[in-house]
Amino acid sequence: MMKNRLMKGSLAALVSLLATNAMAAQEVTVYTAFETDILAKYKSAFEKDNPDIKIKWVRDSTGIMTAKLLAEKNNPQAEVVWGLAGSSMALLKDEGLLKPYTPKGLEDLHANLNDPQSNQAWFGNDAFFNAVCFNEAVAKQLNLPKPTSWEDLTKPVYKGHIAMPNPASSGTGYMQVSAWLQNMGEDQAWNYMRELDKNIAHYTHSGSKPCVQAGMGEVAIGISMASRGAKLKTQGAPLAVITPKGIGWESEAVGLVKESDAAKRVVDWSISKAANELYVEMYPVVAHKEVKATVSNFPNVQANMAKMDFAQMGSKRAEILAAWSEKFDAKSEPKS
């Protein structure tokens, strides 16, 4: 009897150990376009609150990640998409890649950053904005005036001194191209981009890179992310972060691809107050109603925000990118 009890006890302990190990080994594949330098912090915070789940990040810029998800449509590899532009999420939903879901805590979010349709499938994390990063030290050396409008950037004095994200690779680039098209009108916007292209040194495949290059003095001007400009300026880069009237902006969002319990818990946590308290360290506008903060050196964006139609950005994406690539892709940097 004693031997049987010992065997049963050992067996129960073994089953418990195996179950614990199985839970510890549970991994969720998350596709993202969040900036690389914040991924470790988000992963660590989530896993601290959910020790039985591990996040496996797959990261690329918005355009490349959107194309990857569409290419995998018939055999999805992602379980969650977290930190991708709202216009891309709208497109993914239209293509049947995102599952309708009601995450815990949805009522605590600002509704204007979420999927506007009744069968909601994506939910805002933050809003991100474009800006012009202007290196004042380089400008002084080259005698370049400080630009105050988009039209200023077409002046011959800036020839070869501007970097901008390729919109086919970067959501930051695509949302600014969309802002020009939606607010200038298509004919005027394409004419504007032709004039701007004369002054472009190169197009990057990262939304933050033009501002990083401006901060390092590799170019004088980078059309880029306002949050990156603010961060670099706070770190000591000689930058002015300029917001011309009609700056592009968009929500960054999360959505469910596979309906596992673990994937749902990632989505739930991503809209939580704890997650939003991390977002606000970089983004001054976040989805949670109770989370507000001031980001050092972040420009006043509200007065100069373009009117943005995110559904149109999603539906016209392929058409716009094909036209842009045909006209301007020759100046793009090589893809790494």
Predicted regions, residues:
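An extracytoplasmic/periplasmic, membrane-proximal ligand-sensing/linker region
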Residues: 187-188, 287-336
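Periplasmic-binding protein-like
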Residues: 111, 157-165, 192-197, 203-204, 233-258, 270-292, ...
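A bilobed periplasmic-binding-protein/Venus flytrap-type ligand-binding module shared by bacterial periplasmic
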Residues: 133-138, 178, 250-262, 270, ...
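Extracytoplasmic ligand-binding site segments that recognize negatively charged/polar headgroups
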Residues: 33-40, 77-218
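Sec/Tat signal peptide C-region and signal peptidase I cleavage site
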Residues: 20-24
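A ligand-binding cleft/hinge motif common to bilobed small-molecule-binding domains
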Residues: 87-91, 215-238
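Early extracytoplasmic/lumenal segment of secretory-pathway proteins
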Residues: 25-90, 212
